[in-house]
């Protein structure tokens, strides 16, 4: 299927800046999203940790770059992952994005986080965030969006993820999410150190 998110003449995401050089787009995206992430907790707040919040986060971070920010992707995607030997994570089919997301978020919100100790919290939180991330609701920007959602959720529920996590360890975070999403026998230990190291009890 043709990827209609790309320009016709170059394999670069269509963007509001009309940048057709992949490296220049990556640089612009990095600069813009860095600034957006500085004040996102002031812009996206409240007690509802639902699918709309995830869409709002994506819209705020990427709205100056992509007209489809905050909208579900319209194509199925594959991404070769180094830590999987070039294989792809099995992301949600476009027809199942919303129901899978609603189910995953329901599971996340039903946990009684206050009764878990820090190691139990780290393990369960890692599994559930990995499940949400694996759905990959957007064409691009899923990791930054879901990790932002995760940091806000953890703050609200009495445990903390270091907000420098994404900025300072973005490659490791993505690799950990990839490994945690790798098939039926998911290797959550690759993701647990991320949460456990950066989780701090109040």
Regions found by a protein language model. Name each.
Residues 135-170, 185:
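Short conserved catalytic/interaction loops centered on acidic-Pro-aromatic/His motifs
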Residues 197-202:
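Conserved small/polar residues in nucleotide/adenosyl-binding loops
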Residues 180-182:
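A structural-propensity feature for long, helix-poor, extended segments
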Residues 1-72, 153-155, 159-162:
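N-terminal structured helix/loop subdomain that forms the ligand-binding/catalytic interface
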Residues 50, 54, 121, 125, ...:
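Hydrophobic (often cysteine-bearing) scaffold residues that line and stabilize catalytic clefts
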Residues 57-62, 125-132, 173, 177:
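Short alpha-helical scaffolding segments that buttress acidic/His motifs in well-ordered protein cores
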Residues 55-105:
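A glycine-rich, hydrophobic loop/mini-helix early in the fold
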Residues 91-136:
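Helix-hairpin-helix/helix-loop-helix acidic hairpins
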């Amino acid at each position: 299927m043709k990827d209609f998110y790309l320009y016709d003449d170059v394999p670069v995401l269509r963007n509001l800046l009309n940048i057709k050089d992949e490296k220049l787009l990556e640089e612009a995206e990095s600069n813009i999203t860095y600034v957006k992430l500085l004040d996102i907790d002031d812009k996206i707040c409240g007690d509802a940790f639902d699918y709309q919040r995830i869409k709002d986060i994506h819209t705020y971070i990427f709205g100056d770059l992509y007209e489809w920010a905050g909208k579900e992707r319209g194509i199925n995607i594959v991404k070769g992952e180094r830590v999987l030997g070039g294989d792809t994570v099995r992301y949600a089919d476009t027809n199942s994005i919303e129901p899978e997301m609603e189910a995953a978020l329901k599971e996340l919100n039903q946990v009684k986080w206050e009764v878990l100790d820090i190691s139990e919290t780290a393990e369960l939180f890692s599994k559930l965030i990995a499940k949400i991330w694996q759905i990959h609701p957007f064409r691009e920007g899923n990791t930054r969006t879901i990790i932002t959602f995760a940091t806000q959720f953890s703050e609200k529920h009495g445990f903390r993820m270091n907000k420098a996590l994404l900025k300072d360890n973005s490659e490791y975070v993505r690799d950990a999410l990839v490994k945690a999403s790798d098939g039926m026998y998911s290797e959550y230990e690759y993701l647990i150190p991320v949460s456990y190291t950066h989780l701090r009890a109040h």
